Amino acid sequence: TIYRSLFSLARQNPHLIRRACAGALGFGVLSMVFTSMTFVLGSAPYYFSDFEIGLFGLLGVIGIYSSSWSGKTVGQGKENLVAKLCIGLMLFSCVPLYFAQHSLIIYAIGVLMSYFGLTAFHVLNQNLVYRIDGKARSRINAVYMTIYFTGAALGSLGAVYAWQHYQWVGCVVLGLIFSLGILMIDRFDFKRMQKN
């Protein structure tokens, strides 16, 4: 059946699972940022309306440019550079995000950093996993995206839990933990790729 073929593909390609897990953690970071955005902007000192929060969320349009940049740079054979820059952006976005309740501009910078990093990283991951087997592209995509969206769900759930128990600091720490996880998986995977 199709499900057996997907499980078989996943078992036979640990590289696919590593890239998918790294991508899932990245999507988890972004999901945490956007889930908690309502909490941050809807409370003191901003008290934004739902409409205003939605407008602020349009910062995500930067993803259009990050996708284009990532695709071109990966096409030049600079996958490792793209990975390092993307992970660096996601890691260091925690610094401006930490000050979200003190400055809207600094918060916006943090959101842009995390969104740019994740979107470009997603393009990189898809580029890498599609090289595994061009004939199995649809099945590879199914495995990758299933794990990828699981990360988003975990990020949203984690953000709600962190906010309820630890407020905004808890959300930022969660994002940092996810980002460190991305770093470890990504570096391990690149070492394995170099050996192979």
At which residue positions do the language-model features occur?
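Multi-pass alpha-helical transporter architecture, strongest
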Residues: 173-196
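Conserved extracellular-gate-facing transmembrane-helix segments in secondary transporters
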Residues: 22-34, 42, 117-118
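Juxtamembrane intracellular "pre-TM" segments in multi-pass secondary transporters
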Residues: 1-20
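Loop-to-transmembrane helix entry
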Residues: 44-62, 139-143
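Transmembrane alpha-helical cores of Major Facilitator Superfamily
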Residues: 24, 58-62, 112, 142-150, ...
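C-terminal transmembrane helical hairpin of 12-TM major facilitator-type secondary transporters
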Residues: 80-125
